[in-house]
Amino acid sequence: MSNSQAPMQAVEVRVYPIFTVRWLAVHALAIPSVFFLGAIAAMQFISR
């Protein structure tokens, strides 16, 4: 390791986008799922 004057510059910083196709797919499924779980949980407390 004679090349010690270059301190760890091989790692390039990558900025990833937030809104991707995967993000849209996950939230398109997760948001209604949480809504329906809340609705089903609320139905358990309805007394007739």
Swiss-Prot record:
Ranges in coiled-coil conformation = none
Note on how the cofactor is bound = With its partner (PsbE) binds heme. PSII binds additional chlorophylls, carotenoids and specific lipids.
Which residues bind heme per the record? 27
Which terms in the Gene Ontology molecular function aspect does this entry carry? electron transfer activity; heme binding; iron ion binding
Co-factor(s):
heme b
Q: Where are the transmembrane segments?
A: 23-39
Return the protein name: Cytochrome b559 subunit beta
Q: Per the UniProt entry, what species is this protein from, by scientific name?
A: Prochlorococcus marinus (strain MIT 9515)
Gene name of the encoded protein: psbF
